[in-house]
Curated annotation (Swiss-Prot):
Pfam families attached to this UniProt entry: Ribosomal_L9_C (PF03948), Ribosomal_L9_N (PF01281)
Annotated organism of origin: Staphylococcus epidermidis (strain ATCC 35984 / DSM 28319 / BCRC 17069 / CCUG 31568 / BM 3577 / RP62A)
Function: Binds to the 23S rRNA.
Single GO MF annotation: rRNA binding
Protein name, as recorded: Large ribosomal subunit protein bL9
Disulfide bonds, paired cysteine numbers: none
GO CC annotation, single: ribonucleoprotein complex
InterPro entries attached to this UniProt entry: Ribosomal_bL9, Ribosomal_bL9/RNase_H1_N, Ribosomal_bL9_bac/chp, Ribosomal_bL9_C, Ribosomal_bL9_C_sf, Ribosomal_bL9_N, Ribosomal_bL9_N_sf
PANTHER family: 50S RIBOSOMAL PROTEIN L9
UniProt keyword list: Ribonucleoprotein, Ribosomal protein, RNA-binding, rRNA-binding
Domain of life: Bacteria
Gene3D superfamilies: Ribosomal protein L9, C-terminal domain (3.10.430.100), Ribosomal protein L9, N-terminal domain (3.40.5.10)
């Protein structure tokens, strides 16, 4: 019997997958517990429409990320910090401070966890901070660290 899985079932199939399973297993377990629905032409068409919708949503996310990447190319974020002798910072500039400055100065909200800056910024001047905007789209933020 052909079924469309509505949930992941360990060892059998993932959500949205169409598979042939034994009739008893389908009737007594999958259909009864609503882990799957029978693969009728109507259900198959509905699955196809869901997949198209999901693909369109995913493409929209990628397009939005690419637009944000282009916007970030022309932006410079200025962050001020206390310094000691020789332009050395007290502490470091974290991704949290960069995200807050970006929101305040340019009204762009980016999650601090998407920024790739493992040790922070420890010196004055310009630093390019890589940002993972999407699985496929990566951009950079130009950060200018100035003395407070």
């Amino acid at each position: 019997m052909k079924v469309i899985f509505t949930q992941d079932v360990k060892g059998k199939g993932k959500k949205g997958e169409v598979k042939d399973v034994p009739v008893g297993y389908a009737n007594n377990f999958l259909l009864k517990n609503k882990y799957a629905v029978e693969a009728t032409p109507g259900n198959l068409k509905q699955l196809e429409q869901q997949n198209k919708r999901a693909e369109a949503d995913r493409q929209q996310e990628i397009d939005d990320a690419k637009a944000l990447k282009e916007q970030l190319k022309d932006i410079e974020v200025e962050v001020s910090a206390k310094t000691g002798e020789g332009g050395k910072l007290f502490g470091s500039i974290s991704t949290k401070q960069i995200a807050e400055a970006l929101k305040k100065q340019h009204d762009i909200k980016i999650d601090k966890r998407k920024m790739d800056l493992p040790h922070g910024i420890h010196a004055l001047g310009y630093t390019n901070v890589p940002v993972k905007l999407d699985k496929e789209v990566e951009g950079t933020i130009r950060v200018h660290t100035v003395e407070q």
